[in-house]
Amino acid sequence: MDNLDQNPVTARIGMVNFINTAPLYEKWQQLVKRPDWRITEAPPTTLNRMLYNNELDLGFVSSHEYAAHPHLYRLLRGLSISATGPVGSVFLFSKKDPEMLSGKTVLLSSLSQTSVSLVKIILEEYYQVIPNYMSGILTLDGKLPQCAQEKDIQAVLAIGDNALRLRESDLYTVKLDLSEVWQKKTGLPFVFAVWAVREEFCQKDPDSISQIQHQLLRCIEEGKRDLQSICQIVAPRIPMKEKDCFDYLCGMEYDLDANKLKALEVFFDYLIKRGEVPAEALPVKFV
């Protein structure tokens, strides 16, 4: 939903309203009163497309989106959606052990290209299997989409709120937290999303970028201090217990320190070697 109004728009900002962004999003709604900043809420893949098409000036996008079009963007320092170890909301749910998925059909969520690339790296590089992939979005109650109901789906990639719902069900015997696997293999956190700014906006309005970055960092700090009340607001959406929501959000990380930048570089190096993104994805460029 866009908060459209009569004020001249000085910045078009894309935000994800999943549970994992609640500490930022809920505090932004409460604290930031800038009608000249137009907020668009959407899943990561929609924000990816909008930023690419110049329908946004900056926003939370999949890490993969920056790497795919490095000539278009720069990153805001100190901001990400990351996890060190289990993330709790990016899973491969499978009826078989991952080693048994070669030639089997795996449904990939079309909500995040970063998670799609990560699960392919994990299956193909770490488990040495080549499944058959198809794309689709699970229903809110974790059921297969219409396009997949006639297929023999053996595993599904689920992210965000969908994954939080599905991890509590018994539909799949194997529940592989992709961030946890990544950390075991690389020793690094995983950076799922970044704040990317279009190059022309960097040139046009650096002052607005600085103000927006300040508010983002402020909201994240306020949100982390107020997790209990935020969980009271957002836990019923899944639904999940407030304590489970609190534990989940405590595991989310929103900074982009040196270790996370290293993790981003390792991920981008995989993508470059796999031919998914251009070599210009490295080194990472910042505002």
Predicted regions and their residues:
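Secondary-structure end/capping motifs
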Residues: 203-270
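Conserved beta-strand segments of alpha/beta enzyme cores
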Residues: 12, 36-38, 74, 131-132, ...
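Bilobed "Venus flytrap"/periplasmic-binding protein-like clamshell domains
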Residues: 5-30, 88-154, 161, 262-265
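Long, low-complexity C-terminal extensions of enzymes
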Residues: 261, 269-287
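General small-molecule cofactor/ligand-binding pocket signal
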Residues: 38-42, 132-136, 285
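Short, glycine-/small- and polar/acidic-enriched structural segments
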Residues: 16-104, 108-112
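Pocket-lining segment of extracytoplasmic ligand-binding domains
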Residues: 137-231
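Hydrophobic residues within well-ordered alpha-helices
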Residues: 50-52, 148-150, 271
